[in-house]
Amino acid sequence: MKKEWNDIIIRDAVPSDAPVLCRWWNDGAVMAHAGYPNGLGTSVEEIEKQLSPNSRFRHIIIYKGTPIGEMNYIPADETSCEMGIKICESQYQNKGLGKKTLSLFISGLFNDLGYTKIMLDTNLNNTRAQHVYEQLGFTKIRVRENSWKDQLGNWQSAVDYELTPKNFKSYI
């Protein structure tokens, strides 16, 4: 899926994106909310292998010609999918780009791909993301207390969200 709006482009990730993904995925500051405060410890070669067959589900966010983050979606069934986003370059965080990028991506999932429900989860400590999701119309379904351990063995809690087209509030 490729989506464009103003200076934002969301496009399928390709093997040549592996070096930037590797930098992001090995950065503990970027990956901490996903449970990897020390980063993933992966290689460019490993990421290239992952991207070759599955790149239609992983996407790169480009802003004014610069890769700034990634998004993905995974079909859950014929009518619903799970999705995720990371604005990985810190200088582009807290500028409203996440909300606009999510609006663009979600409109594609609903309007272009025909999904009728989008699900996601986030770390309970990631209140900034929760605020954005709720502004977009996501409904908090549940909090899963101490439901998983991060790579340091610390218990983490997650918040599950769902969004339907009826509740979606676009910011583009």
Predicted regions and their residues:
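A short, well-structured alpha-helix characteristic of acyl/acetyltransferase catalytic modules
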Residues: M1-V44, E48, K166-I172
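Conserved acetyl-CoA pyrophosphate-binding loop and the N-cap/start of the following alpha-helix
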Residues: Y92, G96-F105
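Conserved active-site alpha-helix within GNAT-family acetyltransferase domains
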Residues: K99-K100, L124-R142
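Conserved catalytic-core motifs of GNAT/GCN5-like acyltransferases
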Residues: M119-D121, T139-Q156
